[in-house]
A protein has these predicted regions:
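Non-heme di-metal
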Residues: 1-154
Length: 154
C-alpha cells in the first residue's frame, strides 16, 4: 500500500492538525491567564504549547518525507520547494477557501464572521505575493538579506 493511501498517513495528518491546534489553543489560554494575573498558569500553558509544537513538527517531518505538504499535497524539502508549496497554499486560501467561507457565513447570517473571512482572504493574498516574490528572487539568484518587514505579516 502506498503511504498516501494508508491509514497511517491519515493518522499523521490528523495528529499534525490536532497538535498544531493545541499549540494555538494553549497560546491563547496563556494570554487569558496573563490578563487574569495568573503567571504560573500562563507559564504552564506556554510550556505545553511549546511541547505541542514539537509534536506537530515531528509529525510534519514524517509527512514531508513520505507524502509532502499535508495542506497542499506538494513536496516539501529545501526552501525553493517549500516556497512553491507556500504559494500554492496561500493562493488556495485567498482564491477559494476564504471567499467560500465568507459566502457561506454571510448566507447563514454571520456577517461579522464573513467580514473576517474576507479580511483573511486579503491577508492571504498578500502572503502569497510575498512568498512568490521570494520564490522568484531565489530562482533568479537575486535573493538579498531577509526583509525585516516580512515578520510583521506572518
Amino acid at each position: 500500500m502506498s503511504f498516501p493511501d494508508s491509514k497511517t498517513h491519515q493518522n499523521l495528518k490528523a495528529a499534525f492538525a490536532g497538535e498544531s491546534q493545541a499549540n494555538r489553543r494553549y497560546t491563547w489560554m496563556a494570554q487569558v491567564a496573563e490578563k487574569e494575573g495568573l503567571p504560573e498558569v500562563a507559564a504552564l500553558f506556554k510550556h505545553s504549547a511549546d511541547g505541542e509544537t514539537g509534536h506537530a513538527l515531528k509529525h510534519l517531518m514524517f509527512l514531508a518525507a513520505q507524502a509532502g505538504d499535508p495542506a497542499t499535497g506538494m513536496p516539501l524539502g529545501d526552501s525553493l520547494t517549500n516556497l512553491k508549496s507556500a504559494v500554492a497554499g496561500e493562493t488556495y486560501e485567498y482564491t477559494d477557501m476564504y471567499p467560500e467561507f465568507a459566502r457561506l457565513a454571510r448566507e447563514e447570517g454571520y456577517g461579522e464572521i464573513a467580514a473576517w473571512f474576507e479580511t483573511l482572504a486579503k491577508v492571504e493574498r498578500f502572503h502569497a505575493g510575498r512568498f512568490q516574490d521570494a520564490l522568484t528572487k531565489l530562482q533568479s539568484g537575486t535573493m538579498a538579506a531577509p526583509d525585516a518587514d516580512i515578520a510583521k505579516h506572518i
